[in-house]
Structures are given as structure tokens and as C-alpha cells.
Design a protein with these regions (language model features):
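A non-catalytic, amphipathic alpha-helix used as a structural packing/dimerization or gating element
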Residues: 72, 261-264, 295-307, 385, ...
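Conserved glycine-rich beta-strand-loop-beta hairpin in the small C-terminal domain of fold type I
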Residues: 282, 298-309, 321-334, 344
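N-terminal small-domain helix-loop-helix segment of the aminotransferase-like
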Residues: 8-98, 105, 286-287, 292, ...
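Conserved core segment of the aminotransferase class I/II
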Residues: 229-299
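Conserved C-terminal alpha-helix-loop-beta "cap" of PLP-dependent enzymes
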Residues: 258-259, 263, 333-372, 380, ...
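PLP-dependent enzyme catalytic core of the Aspartate aminotransferase-like
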Residues: 1, 350, 364-406
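Conserved core of the PLP fold type I
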Residues: 60-195, 199, 205-227, 301, ...
Length: 406
């Protein structure tokens, strides 16, 4: 049958990360590609006990639920966010099937084809996919190590009149970078002044490598709410990185009218997210010390990041450099200017290691000598092996280039 796809379907792109994961699945390949937490750190027993308690209590967990999500769980998330400096109530929140759905639903209610959206460079690949599916006109804001540049942001707002600024200001995916407090305050002030909604995506913010949380800047949502009155920041979070991704439970908070409109879009999409998963998470938060669990995984991820950093430095590749992230899951490696990491990837896979080429994280003018390396999923004993395999691939790539030139 010759199916006539919609214009929106024809704008759907495939995730480069998902395609890489397909290639590496089941093979003897060490994958530094996916944004995967460490399976050895999943709280398996606590999750199993939570589901057992839910299923042994009554049958209501198997029934349809509220579109906004299980109220006791929303209350607990609101309490955690309030302790983190984001005062919020359950009425300003909706639970979603991971924070990825939150991004999609917000774009669905906000964007018409051709609407301008501002992003960082680089930025989260799957957010670019969502924006592309709604045929947004995506523009990049210049940035430095402190975050996006306020002057360029204001200039682009005046020029483009965007509907949305999408940002991952804390442990950015893919770069691992974190905006400074001063830069955050300026960005929020500008967006409030020009009435531009910010979508602050924060799936990694609780994975911190310094135990003193006061050393980290406040979220954009926290700064925004300090003004009082109308909010210009919608904020997403998730249990995927701090508990387990298969639970598929995230949230978005924002102005109560915004949340009501998102709820209408969610009703049309899937009625509600999984009741049983939300009930199990509620039980988990009641009976499991999630704060201690986050401290444990953060310490282990810090150790793995330092190991990967040391192994990369030991190679002493000409022109290679990176900054160690202060949290999160990714290290952003820059190689010498002539190396194309997309061309390097097949050689890396042949040698038994995978990464994500940096160019997929740009909406335009991609930098081809970058790669994203995940350090959370790979067991520590395999990290040195992964770097050795990457070194072999680089040697082969250079040999191939020499052959082509000759």
C-alpha cells in the first residue's frame, strides 16, 4: 500500500543514539554511546519490594488514573523540588512518560510550523528531534563556558520573536557544561522581560560530584519563582537517571494554566502515564532512602568519570581536550580539527567501542571533531579497554587518511 504520510511525519528524524545502540546490542562492543545509567547500581530489591506492596494492597493500581498523575506521588515530588529551591504545588505539575514526553507535549501546545525556537550549541539530540517534528525554525544562541551569551540572546529575541528557549543548563547533554549563577539570572531576566518561555530540562541535575549542594547554582525555575507572579520557566525532571529509566516517569512544572493545557494534550496522547509505575515510585519514596541512593550513585559516577578522564589524558592525543563535568553522565571530547568523528565511528565499532559523533547535537553548523562519551553505564574495569580500542580506531583513521592523500 502506498501510504501518504503527513508533512509532520516526513519531518520525523531517527535518533542517532538509538541507531548506534541497535548496532552495538548483543555484540562484544563497549558502548560509551547511550545516555544509560549503570545497571549495577539500580535499586533492584527496593523497586521489587515497592511493586510487591502495590500489588498486594488492592487492585486500583491496575485501573485507569488521573491524567495529571497519582496525587500522592505529585505531592512528594513537589516537596522534593521545594527543598531544592523550587517552591511548587501538585496543581502546577503533571506526570509524564519520562521527561521526553514532557518536551513533546509542551512543543505540541506551543509551536506552529515556522515558529522560532532558541537552543544552545550543542544541545540534546532528542529535543532537536521533537522541535523538528513540529517544524520549528531552530536558531542557535552563542555560548561560552559560563552558558549562553546574554547579549546574543537578547539580540536574537528582538530579531526572531521566538516562542521558546530550550536549555539544559545543568550538566548539559552532551557537553556536561553548567551555566554560572550570574548567567542564569541574566537569561531569566531577559526572557521575563521579553515574555519568552524557557523550557529548563534537568534530568541530570541531582547527579552531583561535589557533595556540598550549595556549590552549585540555582535552577532557572528557582530564579524565576523568586520574582513572584507569572512564571517564564517550565521545568522538567525525571526518575530515569536517579532510579531507573524503565519506570518511565517524569514531570513538568509550570504556570497552572500551562499545566492544564498540557493535560489536555496528554489526554489526547495517552490518557495518562502508567498508574502502576507511579504507585510503585510513591511506595519507593515512602520506604527507600532515595537521597542516600543518589549520593551513592553520584560517588560511583564521579569515580568512573575520573577514570575515563585519566585514561584519555594518558593517550596524549595531539589537539585533544575536554573539561571534566561537575556532575551528570557525559564527557565531551574534542579531537584535533581534521578528525571527523562520524567517519571514525565505524572504525571504532569494528574495534569494539562506540560513541556518539558530536555533529548530531547541533541544529546547524555542526563541529565534526567532537564526540560524546558516557561514563556511567560501562563497568570501571572496561573503561581502560574502551579507550584503548578508541586509540586503535584513531590510528586506523589516520592511516586511511594518509592512504587517501597519497
Amino acid at each position: 500500500m502506498d501510504i501518504k504520510y503527513s508533512a509532520a511525519a516526513n519531518h520525523l528524524g531517527s535518533s542517532a543514539v538509538r541507531e548506534i545502540l541497535k548496532v552495538t546490542q548483543g555484540n562484544d562492543i563497549i558502548s560509551l554511546a547511550g545516555g544509560l545509567p549503570g545497571e549495577d547500581l539500580f535499586p533492584l530489591e527496593a523497586v521489587r519490594d515497592a511493586y510487591n506492596r502495590v500489588l498486594s494492597s488492592d487492585t486500583s493500581a491496575l485501573q485507569y488514573g488521573l491524567t495529571e498523575g497519582f496525587t500522592p506521588l505529585r505531592d512528594k515530588i513537589a516537596e522534593r523540588l521545594t527543598r531544592q529551591g523550587i517552591p511548587v504545588s501538585a496543581s502546577e505539575m503533571i506526570l509524564t512518560t519520562g521527561s521526553q514526553q514532557a518536551i513533546d507535549l509542551l512543543c505540541k501546545i506551543l509551536l506552529d510550523p515556522g515558529d522560532a525556537v532558541l537552543v544552545e550549541a550543542p544541545t540534546y539530540l532528542a529535543a532537536l528531534q521533537v522541535l523538528g517534528s513540529y517544524r520549528a525554525d531552530i536558531h542557535t544562541i552563542n555560548n561560552d563556558e559560563q552558558g549562553i551569551l546574554p547579549d546574543h540572546l537578547e539580540n536574537q529575541i528582538q530579531k526572531l520573536r521566538p516562542k521558546l528557549l530550550y536549555a539544559v543548563p545543568t550538566f548539559n547533554n552532551p557537553s556536561g557544561a553548567t551555566w554560572s549563577k550570574e548567567r542564569r539570572e541574566k537569561v531569566v531576566e531577559i526572557c521575563r522581560r521579553y515574555n519568552v518561555l524557557i523550557l529548563e530540562d534537568n534530568p541530570y541535575g541531582e547527579i552531583t560530584f561535589e557533595e556540598n549542594k550549595d556549590l552549585y547554582p540555582p535552577s532557572l525555575a528557582s530564579i524565576d519563582r523568586s520574582y513572584g507572579g507569572d512564571y517564564c520557566v517550565a521545568y522538567t525532571g525525571s526518575f530515569s537517571k536517579i532510579v531507573a529509566p524503565a519506570l518511565r516517569t517524569g514531570w513538568i512544572i509550570g504556570d497552572s494554566n500551562l499545566i492544564k493545557t498540557i493535560a489536555k494534550a496528554k489526554q489526547a496522547a495517552d490518557l495518562h502515564s502508567s498508574t502502576i509505575d507511579q504507585r510503585a515510585l510513591d511506595e519507593l519514596l515512602l520506604h527507600f532512602d532515595i537521597e542516600q541512593h543518589i549520593r551513592v550513585i553520584s560517588r560511583e559516577y564521579y569515580s568512573r568519570m575520573k577514570l575515563l578522564s585519566a585514561e584519555l589524558r594518558s593517550q596524549n592525543w595531539e589537539g585533544a581536550h575536554f573539561l571534566e563535568p561537575r556532575g551528570g553522565m557525559f564527557l565531551w571530547l574534542t579531537l584535533s580539527q581534521e578528525i571527523n568523528t562520524k567517519e571514525l565511528l565505524p572504525l571504532a565499532v569494528e574495534n569494539g567501542v562506540a560513541f556518539v559523533p558530536g555533529e548530531v547535537f547541533y541544529s546547524s553548523q555542526p563541529l565534526k571533531n567532537k564526540m560524546r562519551l558516557n561514563f556511567t553505564h560501562t563497568p570501571p574495569e572496561l573503561i581502560p579497554v574502551a579507550v584503548q580500542r578508541l586509540e586503535k580506531a584513531l590510528v586506523q583513521w589516520r592511516e586511511n587518511q594518509s592512504t587517501v592523500r597519497s
